[in-house]
Amino acid sequence: MQRTERDPHPDASEREALSRRDLLAAAAAAVAAGSCGASGDDLAAAAAEASAAEPDAPAGMRYRTLGRTGVRVSEIGFGGVPIDDPEVLLYAAERGVNYVDTSPCYRGGRSERTIGEALAKRRDRFVVTTKWCPHHFGKEPRKQVFLDSLDGSLERLRTDHVDVVLNHEVGKRSDGLGFARLENPEMLEAFETAKKAGKVRFLGASGHDGDLMDVMTRAVDSGHFDVLLCRYSFLDYPDQQKLIDRAHAAGVGFVCMKTLAGAKGADLERFRGRNATFKQAALKWVLANERVSNLVISISSRRQVDEYAAASGSAMTLAERAALAEYAAEFSDQICRFCNRCEPACPHDVRIADALRFSMYFHEYGERERALESYAALEPAARAGSCAACPGYCVPACSYGLPVRDLLLRAHAALGRERGSATA
């Protein structure tokens, strides 16, 4: 196979700029300074001004405006992937969480069904987001396919409307169609039809691809999308702030996911016995950016609700910044950024970023069922089964110095067993 998309091997100057020493130093410095490059005190003041407590909300939870939608959303959003008990979501509402994110492709629709049990009791307490998933559609989906998908979500959620529907996993690598899924006129027509019928209020886009900046910039500039759902953490690449600023200027809400930077060693020893956790520190770092609307994080228990809700309305301490800097120094060259820079170097067309993302779900997030189903949904050739006999062309192509081949072998060993069904 001839690889002509881009040179997968950075030139000497680029490799030098991204040397392990400099990379770790840059990561640690970014964490220590806080997001946006401002001082910690300035960030805390700006974030406090951007967020506010609602009159009838529980003490502690802060709220921000979701871009031009005008909707007030809790700083901590409920990620619905692992939920099994609707009472956990109702408990989150008691703690002030009003934003819930789900999808028909989460656990075969079980996430939506469980959330629907809670919505049937207290729909008025929640801002509900679901998704249009590429797993359900062909290469050129028609308008009715989108409408049928939304109707299925509404039935499972036991509601007559959702607040936001996200065109999910847009990007060049997600389906090989470039920006076609983002700008599909059938999707846009379906949204307008559903909106007129009162089934949805706002349209958004979400994605994991390495071309995140290009795709989401296009989404902002198109004027079609009211909300973006993007990864954002203290280990993400520095120019992501440009996208956040662009979205803010256009009035597009920016919701953050993948906020824990891999969650390796999620409760580090230096936090044990204190009033904060690593996860709280990571969430506070995200919320220090006054231009993000809120964040979503997977929640399955009341304990997690309490832990994550405590991150709202409180500024990072110096000890927390130092701990995140130590984490960055320890794990920066072990965590995939899903940038896709290494993929053109692969002679087997392995979906490297996807495989490592699903491995993260399995090993770090503990979401084993989701990881197994997602990996099984990849075409067999796109999985990492061919990596054992490959010398590892991906390794020198990684800008972050990751042992990519070893990570892929680990992923395939955990996820490669056959399953009877793919992601729904």
Language model features with spans:
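Structured C-terminal cap/extension of enzyme domains
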Residues: A38, H224, K242-A424
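C-terminal segment of N-terminal export signals and the immediately downstream linker at the start
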Residues: A38-I76
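Catalytic domains of carbohydrate-active enzymes, especially glycoside hydrolases
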Residues: V88-R107
